[in-house]
Amino acid sequence: MAWMRLPFETERSLMLLRASARRAKQMACAASLAVVVLCSHYALAADAPANDSYNIISADDPVARSNSEILASDPSEQVALRGKTAALGRVYPPPQLNRISVSSNGTGALKLSERPSFDSRLGDQYAHLTNNNNYVFYTVDPDLQDFVSGIVDAAQASHVAVVAMNPQNGKILAIAGKSRTVKDVEYHAGFPAASLFKVVTAAAAVEQAGIRPESIISFRGGTYTLNEWNYRPDPARDRRFMSVAEALGRSCNPVFGHLGSRYLNGSILLRYAQLFGFNRSLDLEAPLPPSQATIPNDDLFELSRTAAGFGEVRISPIHAAAITAGVANGGLMPRPQLIDRIVSPDGSVIHQSSPETLQRIVQPQTAKLLLEMMEYTTTVGTSRREFMRGTTPTLGNFPVAGKTGTLRGTDPKGLNNWFIGAAPINNPQLAVAVITVDPRYSSKASHLGRLVFQKYFNITPVEYVPVRSSSTRSSSKSKKLYSYRAPTSSSKKASTKKYYAKKKKK
């Protein structure tokens, strides 16, 4: 059959028919897609926390968080609720939260029935559920808490505890510990305070004896030797000299022994120990035994030992962090806080914590001097290897005021290794206390403390730059300006004999 061209009108009709068929096919596909999307929407809406029938908060009770993120199905409700008092974040069924009992005394202070374990979250905070279904939110920073828990678990020591606190309001930002024999080691008040007590002695010496950081104290014997032979000041035999600031940084026992027996007395030292929180409760929400300090008054030798950190002084890691926070907070010791707020099931805030001060431990100027003296610990003293790389600070523009302590204890048994610190010195934002017992080098308290500072301030440690020999010689000479041994008469005679022997040879 020969091909023949259709008339124009017929051809146009066929083209329109084909176009209509294509449009009908597209509309059918679009309708199918719309059905799928609509079904998915309703399926997701049914599973949403706001519409979950198992959720204790229904879709009719949208709840806001502190950052105004609202859990509601209606956008108009989100606009209406924006800016209201924060209560809850994302809501989960109650079985996902551990429970804890909270009571209140006559003054309104809250008390937890036990020391909380941070193992359950609600939104972006750690939380527990009370017996009457109220939510208890804690002050800990989840990121810092997870990091601290990690380094505590990895630490090679028989007992470890780390406490990080905001010195300005007393909020505990991280707290973790591990021990095979001591329950809740972070709150255990049986650790010897060791040289941490030198901070108390230094505070008393500054305010009661007029001692300054640059004051020079003479002594004899080794830097860490304090016994019945050298505890009494003797100008005729004391041939070594050291400033009080460097003595605190290097933890020089004879210098602080002299401060206790020569410039202070037992009653003054006991009063300052009580100001720093010893022999009294810190009024924490969780059960916390008080730290104990026994200060001798009649025995000068025992008074010297106590002033240097060898006495009967016991302290808990959380109390050590509170002392550090008190010095960093201008002399006002904040009350440590674990509870941030308590929220009812309907989203209303029942309790909101606010900063509280236990008492003033030292004057603001004294606190400033103590921070300056404690900086010697991290620059030239016992923590120098952790916080300095050659002549460069490890933490860069975040200078750290610190203090170490090392002493063998009995509860628990072992060599106790302490570090407390606050940074930055000009405006402290974090106070840290670390205790390790029988640690390996990589798990010493100063090392763990440095890691906590690096994590909190998001600092990358500086690379080590070797110091040239000329700089090393000059730095060693500068150190002798702070601590040197005076020549004895025997050394003078020996040098005189060498001089005349050389003269005879000539």
Question: What are the language-model segments listed below?
Answer:
Residues T181-S195:
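A short, polar/charged loop-to-alpha-helix boundary motif
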